[in-house]
């Protein structure tokens, strides 16, 4: 790492007021001293709490990532403090989420009414409160800052310079990538976000990418230094997402034993493309009308932001496509509010397949979780989904978002039990590649490397 890289202040050299050196003078003079162990990590997840229900508001895969990584780090003896913005007065300022994992709810702006697009106006207040929380602790309280999403990265960069510790950053999503793959009618990410992301990429000591594809995007689209980018795959809680008896799962969920269940699970937003699935189902039924009597399409999740239980536009589309049962044939589409991880695992196990038609995914956690239950995935051949799903082995990848192509892929799985069984076996095999324990070990290696390179820089 170059200590003189713009935006990176050398450690242990002329610290400003209130800063402390990561390495004391005596230690710097002793080449035998090894890098101190990582004892405590400050996780920053400004815009969404890891305690929120995934599938609601802005809560999704990132929430699962932050809390699961934190739990696994704590299991290795590393204390984790997660800083997030309070969105209700009902939560305590400090919550002991798990042994070794604390969630600190920071008051920054009103509890309700702020959209994610309005949160940059609260960065200053949020950052101030994070710095105050650290200032109340002994000097050197945190060894690493790990920020998630660009808003958190802005705060993390300030904490990095103030505390004299390395900043590790995970993008999770990137504006330039999203804008290159916009759904029809979706709103482009603003220039302010792009600028903010570029600043975070420049400020971070290490960048964690979910896949090789994301790593290349960081280098090619954001001019990230390749030597500062490490690929660490997210994991799956294999204790929760595991094979279950399908008949039992269906009985618990009120699904017919002989149903063809095409599950969509996630936030209902243009990027996730649930409309593509509905149009594909309509195409499938037009070509194979005899499927209607046993076809069930659960849409499990809620819209981004506050929203309704199911957005009117998607419900209207289901009606227009004749999938709502208004004609007396019974509803094909069922809207299901967001569910717990345990309940989601049951839905995945009950499904014939899980559909992930997103226009982009940095990883595609729900696809990995579905495979861990032994359920094949039909996914768009975009972003991290091409890493998670092995085409023809654990599921099918669809190169387009054309409903006809999607209908063909759905039909291949629904109508061929032997093929589906082969995919199910491959899904279980593929799922073994992803565990949160492995993610935590690799992430800890990134933390250690960031600390070691800061020592070299000073």
From Swiss-Prot:
Positions binding UDP-N-acetyl-alpha-D-glucosamine in this chain are 53-54, 61, 267, 272, 339, 361, 369
Pfam families in UniProt: Glyco_trans_4_4, Glycos_transf_1
An example GO biological process term is: mycothiol biosynthetic process
EC?
A: 2.4.1.250
UniProt-annotated stretches for the region Disordered: 1-29
Record-annotated membrane-spanning stretches: none
Q: Describe the task this protein carries out.
A: Catalyzes the transfer of a N-acetyl-glucosamine moiety to 1D-myo-inositol 3-phosphate to produce 1D-myo-inositol 2-acetamido-2-deoxy-glucopyranoside 3-phosphate in the mycothiol biosynthesis pathway.
Output the PANTHER family linked to this UniProt entry: SULFOQUINOVOSYL TRANSFERASE SQD2 (PTHR45947:SF3)
The protein, known as = D-inositol 3-phosphate glycosyltransferase
- The protein's organism comes out as Nocardioides sp. (strain ATCC BAA-499 / JS614)
């Amino acid at each position: 790492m170059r200590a003189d890289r713009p935006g990176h202040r050398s450690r242990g050299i002329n610290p400003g007021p209130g800063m402390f050196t990561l390495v004391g003078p005596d230690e710097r003079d002793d080449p035998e001293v090894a890098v101190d162990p990582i004892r405590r990590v400050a996780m920053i997840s400004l815009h969404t709490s890891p305690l929120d229900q995934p599938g609601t508001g802005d809560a999704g895969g990132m929430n699962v990532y932050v809390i699961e990584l934190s739990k696994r780090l704590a299991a290795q003896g590393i204390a984790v403090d997660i800083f997030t913005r309070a969105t209700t007065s009902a939560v305590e300022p400090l919550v002991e989420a798990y042994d070794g994992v604390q969630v600190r709810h920071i008051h920054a702006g009103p509890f309700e009414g702020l959209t994610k697009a309005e949160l940059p106006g609260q960065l200053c207040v949020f950052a101030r409160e994070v710095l105050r929380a650290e200032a109340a602790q002994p000097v050197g309280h945190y060894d690493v800052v790990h920020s998630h999403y660009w808003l958190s990265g802005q705060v993390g960069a300030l904490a990095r310079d103030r505390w004299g510790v390395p900043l590790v950053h995970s993008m999770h999503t990137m504006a330039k990538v999203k804008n290159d793959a916009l759904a029809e009618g979706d709103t482009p990410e603003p220039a302010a976000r792009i600028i903010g992301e570029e600043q975070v990429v420049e400020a971070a000591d290490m960048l964690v990418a979910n896949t090789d594809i994301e790593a290349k995007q960081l280098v090619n689209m954001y001019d990230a230094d390749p030597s500062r980018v490490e690929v660490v795959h997210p994991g799956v809680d294999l204790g929760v997402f595991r094979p279950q008896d399908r008949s039992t799962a269906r009985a618990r969920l009120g699904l017919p034993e002989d149903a063809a269940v095409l599950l969509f699970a996630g936030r209902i937003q243009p990027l996730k493309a649930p409309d593509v699935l509905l149009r594909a189902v309509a195409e499938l039924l037009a070509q194979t009308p005899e499927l209607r009597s046993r076809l069930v399409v659960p849409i499990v999740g809620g819209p981004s932001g506050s929203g309704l239980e199911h957005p009117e536009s998607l419900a209207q589309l289901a009606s227009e496509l004749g999938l709502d049962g208004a004609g007396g044939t019974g509803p094909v589409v069922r809207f299901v509010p967001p569910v717990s991880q345990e309940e989601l695992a049951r839905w995945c196990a009950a499904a014939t397949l899980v559909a992930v038609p997103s226009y982009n995914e940095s990883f595609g956690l729900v696809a990995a979780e579905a495979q861990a239950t032994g359920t094949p995935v039909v996914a768009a051949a975009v972003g991290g989904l091409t890493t998670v799903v092995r085409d023809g082995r654990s599921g099918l990848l669809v190169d387009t978002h054309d409903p006809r192509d999607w209908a063909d892929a759905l039909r291949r799985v629904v109508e061929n039990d032997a093929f589906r069984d082969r995919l199910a076996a491959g899904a279980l095999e593929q799922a073994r590649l992803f565990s949160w324990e492995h993610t935590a070990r690799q992430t800890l290696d990134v933390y250690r490397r960031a600390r070691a390179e800061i020592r070299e820089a000073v």
